[in-house]
Amino acid sequence: MVENSELRKAGLKVTLPRVKILQMLDSAEQRHMSAEDVYKALMESNEDVGLATVYRVLTQFEAAGLVVRHNFDGGHAVFELADGGHHDHMVDLDTNEVIEFTSPEIEALQHKIAEEHGFDLVD
């Protein structure tokens, strides 16, 4: 099972809650999910994982590099699987829809500005 190997590779013990949460994030139509979203989706699937466990596991996943945390909505944290590819986000403030995009022009401009100020971009 892919989830098991991903957890082991990240240095995490394979537990049922971790597997269920990783599966949920991987299969969800919504790419950016809050802990509450994950919890509700698990409940709708009749999975018995508590909200505190969801918060704890998402924090562990973030520390292990399996997910990335974003604070789009006034500090409200959402998580997405870390797929290794860099992309940026735009948020529609009326609908809270998150739009992902990549732009070589923006990336080049960021590197140019960083270089002009003597910085190296790390992310």
Swiss-Prot record:
User: Which InterPro entries does this UniProt record tie to the protein?
Assistant: FUR, Fur_C, WH-like_DNA-bd_sf, WH_DNA-bd_sf
Residues annotated as region DNA-binding? 1-83
Organism field:
Pseudomonas fluorescens
The taxonomy runs: Bacteria, Pseudomonadati, Pseudomonadota, Gammaproteobacteria, Pseudomonadales
For the ligand (Zn(2+)), the binding residues are: 32, 80, 89, 100
Q: Which residues bind Fe cation?
A: 86, 88, 107
- The record's disulfide annotation reads none
Q: Name one GO molecular function term.
A: DNA-binding transcription factor activity
| Gene this chain is encoded by | fur
Localized where?
Answer: Cytoplasm
- Please tell me whether the keyword Manganese is annotated for this protein: no
Task: Indicate yes or no for the key word Repressor.
Answer: yes
What does this protein do, in the record's words?
Acts as a global negative controlling element, employing Fe(2+) as a cofactor to bind the operator of the repressed genes.
Region (Dimerization) location: 84-123
How it assembles, according to the record, is: Homodimer.
Q: Which GO terms describe its biological process?
A: negative regulation of DNA-templated transcription; negative regulation of siderophore biosynthetic process
Please classify the protein's predominant subcellular localization into one broad category. Answer: cytoplasm
- So which domain of life are we looking at? Bacteria
| Keywords for the protein's UniProt record, in alphabetical order | Cytoplasm, DNA-binding, Iron, Metal-binding, Repressor, Transcription, Transcription regulation, Zinc
Q: What is this protein called?
A: Ferric uptake regulation protein
Q: Which GO terms describe its cellular component?
A: cytosol
Q: Which family does it belong to?
A: Belongs to the Fur family.
